[in-house]
């Protein structure tokens, strides 16, 4: 049985790919690319494609639906684990590419136990998480001194839930803010953070955009590839 590398390719800028990730991609026999539905394409692949122009690796797309139906998802993860293991028979080297870092809301980690069940050797290669890149771009410190940091998704939460998180933590990163913009707006206002947030969308790409104005945010359609950093207003 071959070996699979789970590779974080960073948030969007191809130049933020790590040297180790680059070297593994050069030697990979197969590169596995997650996509939300068949034929939709892979943003992770768009990040690496210029780095593998001379590669002879086989590119395999794997479908990962963007919903939360547990049983259906588990079947898909198991099937993708089987597909990956089949491709790596005969001591082949594979690379499963994923946005940001594999340990942060990554399709790879959901699939990992199902790949291991087939006896495939696995190594995880870290990448730059989107919220770290966003903090750098916006020059926003994520933590200082004894402050804490919470990273949490927005998933059709009630405004009360989000407000509670903002009141309990010094620094908050909300992933997937497009999931419930209205609840997010309410929570920002109720926690008094209208002047201490930054929305960063499509970080590291040509479409990158930063929004720090609450009124502008109210009128803006937040795309899926976005995140928000919120600081304590007293800081």
For each feature predicted by the language model, list its residue ranges.
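Class I SAM-dependent methyltransferase SAM-binding "motif I" and its flanking Rossmann-like core
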Residues: 103-168, 233-234
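General beta-strand structural signal in soluble alpha/beta enzymes
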Residues: 33, 61, 96-98, 124-127, ...
């Amino acid at each position: 049985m071959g070996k699979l590398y789970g590779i974080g390719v960073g948030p969007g800028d191809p130049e933020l790919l790590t040297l180790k990730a680059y070297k593994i991609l050069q030697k990979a026999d197969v590169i596995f690319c997650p996509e939300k539905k068949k034929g939709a394409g892979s943003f992770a692949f768009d990040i690496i494609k210029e780095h593998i122009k001379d590669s002879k690796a086989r590119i395999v797309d794997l479908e990962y639906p963007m919903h939360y139906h547990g049983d259906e998802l588990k079947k898909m993860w198991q099937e993708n684990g089987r597909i990956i293991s089949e491709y790596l028979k005969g001591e082949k080297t594979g690379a499963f590419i994923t946005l940001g870092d594999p340990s942060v809301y990554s399709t790879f980690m959901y699939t990992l136990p199902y790949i291991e069940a087939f006896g495939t050797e696995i190594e995880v290669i870290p990448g730059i998480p989107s919220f770290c890149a966003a903090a750098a771009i916006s020059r926003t410190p994520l933590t200082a001194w004894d402050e804490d940091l919470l990273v949490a998704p927005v998933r059709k939460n009630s405004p009360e839930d989000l407000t509670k998180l903002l009141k309990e933590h010094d620094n908050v990163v909300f992933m997937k803010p497009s999931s419930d913009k209205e609840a997010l707006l309410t929570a920002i206002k109720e926690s008094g953070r209208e002047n201490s947030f930054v929305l960063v969308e499509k970080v590291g790409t040509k479409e990158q955009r930063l929004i720090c104005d609450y009124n502008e945010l109210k009128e803006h359609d937040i795309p899926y590839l976005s995140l928000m950093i919120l600081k304590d207003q007293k800081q």
